[in-house]
């Protein structure tokens, strides 16, 4: 009878071990009927719509756009008006007379930034009267046009155009910076999606091993009660169950933290990732070419180029500001005078005009010189930053390409090791069946297989993350 039971238990334990080992090759099924499967793109779209960092980046672009809008105010038409009243005592032929003047003027001024020209036009009216017997009031209406044309400083509107051109450059730079900053902010969530799948796969794997380990434990307990195995096998069987349970709970803690983080964006929705995205993205990551794209072809390099061009342009304007202010000025006025207001406005038959030059030049011009020196230093600084970023890019790109090649080799070795461990397991199982090996040795090999399979899942996720970093780093404008 004992011989018969011994044969039965020898069959049961290897069968249970085979169940444990086979469980690692499959994935335990979950009840996912009520869960909504969310694809990778939909996941990112949802994050991008809510991520506050991205909203902040968009605000920076809107601020730059608003600055551009406001920069054109230099060419706005300005309306001006003035009115005055005065009383003066004048002496005429030994007598004192009271002179009263009323004057008003209204006009429009427009600056043409493309040429550095300022044009004003308007109308004026003066009324003068003397308080004396028989005196009358005189009316002086007038129309005028005058201009101011810069010849040295601000020649052809180089200074007037600066505000608009600088704002345009800053707007273009900010739009590129938004893309780069958005990419950096969303990079974490791209990887988080595949970490989510990784945790799920590992939890399923551990759950299936726990099921198999419990079957081993029950089989060994029965055999122990019959006195067919010693306490060591019983402890080993119980220990492997606890080992997998601890590993499961530790990983489940990480999964709960991940779900809590995602809950910020998905508001307690019962969602799961599309597990098919993992092998598809992994295949893309493995088959893509990791080219050594030069830094000057990337969007970051384009940002540097635009920034440098902006600084060079600023330096040119600053140099122009060091020139003297030499302007060609002129005015043309039509006017008339009459004691009758109606007659004075009927025919503006008198003409005044002048043409001349205006010259001003600060002897030190400290502010403009300081601005020019500051801009030249900024150009030197941006050149240094470009070189630093170029070196950093080359370092990062080299590491990514190297990591990809290394990961391919390591993955091949790990998969080969799983094959060897499988063979080792079968050999040890045979020895155990022949009572030439203890249960713990077989269990240790099963644990090695488990760890190696988990390492393969993690390595594949690292390959995906490496590809995401490569795509972000080398993205062109």
Predicted segments with their positions:
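Periplasmic alpha-helical coiled-coil/stalk elements that build and connect Gram-negative outer-membrane
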Residues: 2-3, 7-10, 30, 165-169, ...
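Bacterial N-terminal signal peptides
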Residues: 13-22
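Amphipathic alpha-helical coiled-coil segments
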Residues: 54-71, 181-206, 240, 258, ...
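Coiled-coil termination/hinge junctions
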Residues: 71-72, 78, 262, 314-319, ...
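Metallo-beta-lactamase
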Residues: 251, 299, 382, 459
